[in-house]
Amino acid sequence: MKRAMGFLLSSVMLLGVLSGCGGQNSSSASPAASGSQAEGQSGEQVTLTYWQHSSAARDEMMTKLVAQFEAENPDIKVNCEFVPEADYTQKLIPSLATDTAPDVFQVQSGMVSKLAEAGSIQPLDETVMSTEMIEEEFVAAATDGLKYEDKYYGMPTDMQTILCFWNKDLAAEAGLDAEKGPQTWDEFFDWARAMTKRDASGALTQAGWGTSGYWPEVVSYIEQMGGSFYDESTNQFVFADDEKSVAAMEQWISLYRDDKVYDTQFSKTWAGFRQGLIGMMLGHPAMLGNLPTTAPDLNFGVSLIPANGDSRASCVSSWGYVMSAKAPSEAATRFIEFLSSEDVEKQWTLQTGELPARKALLDDADIKADPKASVALASLDDAFVGHLQTAALETAWSESYEKLMYTDEDVKTVLQECQANLNQELSNGL
């Protein structure tokens, strides 16, 4: 289901090194991690614990925001813990069955329904953030995945869509329009072939497109080709039974299998793009802020995802701020409300390059000042929510896609196995 959305990016980095949230060391659990202080009589301070998957920019930004929140809300103290992303889910899920669960935390949006069904999280406090207000002020595609049985259980963060990036110098060398970029999928695939180079022995020396099956890219292509990836009426993956989806996947993987525009042994995808070894990438708008910092000499262009006819459908992936079942509802929702406020969303967007979800920010002059940011905003005019948004689903997809890359197994057969594994995972509990 497509929804208009909002987004942007910036390469502005947060200045200075800030102390840990709420006076706690950000690399270790706070003393309050074993349970929050309950909301008590007037004048009592409530202590919340907050967890998020760690990255330097996000951690520093959250530290700053928590200090701002505590100054504005002296009756609430927030202790933070920043967990390495590789360990985050393994640490979080077991904690939800114990007193060690955080009060407020980030979770992939695909986990919300499972956590809500299990009773591990609670709906947002309607007295603080009403359903009417959320649906009036936020873009639907940003919040749809955070709703369960007509109640909102969280607010969005870390939202991304898919854009097209290309190396202008490599494109020009290949005789391509380096300023315009590929506008259709036929052009995109032709560009990938044109920018692929091999030496006399046949060894790859330049890859045309760093394609490795990242699911939002693939699902965007399937959607544009008229395929059905997921049936919302049955809550089941259906791509292996859909002729258009299978045909789209056969075309997609043929660029790797047959045209050999990339080889995973040649270079990692984004590392190779930064080094000038890969001609094109599909990826998140956050790379618009990342690339000038990590590859300052890279001459790159960016455009909307290639089109099929009038469709530039782009898949949205996101996380959400939610609160555990044990959290003090009013205080925890106030913290989530703060993190979702217009001012904070704008700060977060400019500092981290992630998508704003508030409608009011879609035409923000500061965000749109960067021409590349305007492209990112436009990409969300034809956006839809993806359904592979849990770690387990992503792993099952990646394992199947590796078979497509590294073996000559029949595409439909691999997709049928993948679909069965994904649907089985949907039926699994936490």
Give residue spans per PLM region.
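Long, aromatic- and glycine/proline-rich binding clefts that accommodate carbohydrate-like moieties
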Residues: 145, 303, 349-403, 428
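Glycine-centered hinge/linker elements that transmit conformational signals in sensory
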Residues: 189-196, 234-263
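Periplasmic solute-binding protein
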Residues: 112-120, 141-180, 210-234, 315-323, ...
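Extracytoplasmic "Venus flytrap"/periplasmic binding protein-like
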Residues: 68-138, 147, 173-175, 183, ...
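Hinge/lid segment of periplasmic solute-binding proteins
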Residues: 40, 108-163, 189, 222, ...
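Extracytoplasmic/periplasmic substrate-recognition and gating elements
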Residues: 67, 71-72, 77, 172-174, ...
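Short, solvent-exposed loop/beta-turn-alpha elements that line the ligand-binding surface or hinge
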Residues: 122-138, 180-183, 199-208, 227-247, ...
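Conserved C-terminal helix/tail region of periplasmic/extracytoplasmic solute-binding proteins
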Residues: 172, 178, 254, 379-430
